């Protein structure tokens, strides 16, 4: 059997991990073993949080819409129900933006939705 020298392959593999660990503190960016553990943990967290971010933003939008709706004398659930009946198809992200950046326009949406009870 021929001898296999893994020098280049192993070095490349380790350098790849250490490159990903750049910016980590202390030995987490210098020693291969701890760096490898931290990179795996970071990638796992990134994967999980890419999905969590979508849920977090939806919760934030709903909270903002609820606050603005209550300022206009209606709860969030009532507003969404009335909007469905009035065929107003504005998504939650746009509604939250309206509530913050243009309160008068948001008030108009609430008024239009409540008119179509």
UniProtKB/Swiss-Prot annotation:
Function: Binds directly to 23S ribosomal RNA and is necessary for the in vitro assembly process of the 50S ribosomal subunit. It is not involved in the protein synthesizing functions of that subunit.
NCBIfam families referenced in this protein's UniProt entry, alphabetically: rplT_bact
Name of the protein: Large ribosomal subunit protein bL20
UniProt cross-references to PANTHER family, sorted A to Z: 39S RIBOSOMAL PROTEIN L20 (PTHR10986)
GO CC annotation: ribonucleoprotein complex; ribosome
Any GO BP: translation
Manganese found in the keyword field: no
A Pfam family this chain is assigned to: Ribosomal_L20
Disulphide bond pairs: none
Family: Belongs to the bacterial ribosomal protein bL20 family.
Keyword RNA-binding in annotation: yes
Top-rank taxon, per record: Bacteria
Organism: Crocosphaera subtropica (strain ATCC 51142 / BH68) (Cyanothece sp. (strain ATCC 51142))
GO molecular-function terms, A-Z: rRNA binding; structural constituent of ribosome
Keywords in alphabetical order: Ribonucleoprotein, Ribosomal protein, RNA-binding, rRNA-binding
């Amino acid at each position: 059997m021929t001898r296999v020298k893994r020098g280049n392959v192993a070095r490349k593999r380790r350098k790849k991990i250490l490159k990903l660990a750049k910016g980590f503190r202390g030995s987490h960016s210098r020693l291969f073993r701890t760096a490898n553990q931290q990179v795996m943990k970071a990638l796992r967290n990134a994967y999980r949080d890419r999905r969590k971010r979508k849920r977090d933003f939806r919760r934030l939008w709903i909270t903002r819409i609820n606050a603005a709706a209550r300022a206009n004398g209606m709860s969030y659930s009532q507003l969404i129900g009335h909007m469905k009946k009035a065929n107003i198809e504005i998504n939650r992200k746009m509604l939250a933006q309206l509530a913050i950046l243009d309160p008068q326009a948001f008030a108009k949406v609430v008024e239009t939705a409540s008119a179509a009870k």
